[in-house]
Curated annotation (Swiss-Prot):
Coiled coil: none annotated. It comes from the Eukaryota. This is Ribosome maturation protein SBDS. Belongs to the SDO1/SBDS family. Its main location: cytoplasm. It is found in: Cytoplasm; Nucleus, Nucleolus; Nucleus, Nucleoplasm; Cytoplasm, Cytoskeleton, Spindle. It comes from Caenorhabditis elegans. Required for the assembly of mature ribosomes and ribosome biogenesis. Together with K10C3.5b/EFL1, triggers the GTP-dependent release of ribosome maturation factors from 60S pre-ribosomes in the cytoplasm, thereby activating ribosomes for translation competence by allowing 80S ribosome assembly. Required for normal levels of protein synthesis. May play a role in cellular stress resistance. May play a role in cellular response to DNA damage. May play a role in cell proliferation. Pfam families: SBDS_C, SBDS_domain_II, SBDS_N. Signal peptide: none annotated.
């Protein structure tokens, strides 16, 4: 005679989940989410709670399917509405990540930083790009530590000075064209030249000024402010190239 095996009423087994955990009043509360959706919810790229939560249920242990008791929820959160409690845990709880998942995420983040750095730098001697794989290897060898509270761009900028200790790299320069009307041209000319690292065109025509050259990326804001303020909006600043490079990657063995 066959027998039906039933899951106890205080258990609900889920699989392939991302668990978010919160501890309050000495008790553990967990929610079951779809993988990769917790981060999307927290950065507001996902606004549909049902795309994030697998169930509007609070657990004491997701992996064992054990549900939290009503009295424990009220004692910890002051409410018994499980959806509202799920939202609190989703916003403020700790996302549980396995060591394998953590390592995979770290590797991916490091790769993103390496690609960003590769888009920002060149070899100072050849002016050629440096392959992301070379940068990635150098970051790993120096045990560069990623910081979860900083963006990939911030971490790329943090890493560049350290990479200079082992790699021949420098920030790639921007190519800029500036046009200044006759009235302000003479008074602005000297100030402009101090912001260019290399001037390719310094042309006067009917009293107006045109300059083309290379600047450090960090000088762009100062140059933009100078042109805007000194000419009261009549000057023109044009970006010809965000990264002045010789075509083709530099191969480093």
């Amino acid at each position: 005679m066959s027998k039906n095996i039933k899951t106890p009423t205080n258990q609900k087994v889920l699989t392939n989940v991302a668990v978010v955990r919160m501890k309050k009043t000495g008790k553990r509360f967990e929610i079951a989410c779809y993988k990769n959706k917790v981060v999307n919810w927290r950065n507001k790229s996902e606004k549909d709670i049902d795309e994030v939560l697998q169930t509007h249920t609070v657990f004491s242990n997701v992996s064992k399917g054990q549900l939290s008791k009503k009295e424990e929820l009220i004692a910890a959160f002051g409410i018994e509405d499980q959806l509202e409690i799920c939202k609190i845990i989703l916003d403020k709880g700790d996302l549980q990540v396995s060591e394998k998942e953590r390592q995979a995420a770290s590797d991916q983040s490091l790769k993103e930083v390496s690609q960003l750095i590769a888009s920002m730098v060149v070899n100072p001697e050849t002016k050629r790009p440096v392959p992301p794989s070379v940068i990635d290897k150098a970051l790993q060898e120096m045990h560069f530590s990623l910081k979860p509270n900083r963006s990939s761009k911030q971490q790329a900028l943090d890493a560049i000075p350290k990479l200079r200790e082992t790699l021949k790299i420098e920030r790639a320069k921007m190519k800029i064209r500036v046009a200044i009307p006759t009235k302000e041209a003479k008074s602005v000319h000297t100030k402009l030249k101090t912001l260019f690292s290399d001037v390719e065109v310094d042309d006067w025509q009917d009293g107006s000024l045109e300059m083309v050259g290379l600047i450090e990326p960090g000088s762009f804001r100062a140059l933009d402010d100078l042109v805007r303020n000194e000419t009261k909006g009549h000057g023109r600043l044009e970006i010809l190239s965000l990264k002045d490079v010789v075509e083709g990657e530099l191969q480093i063995s």
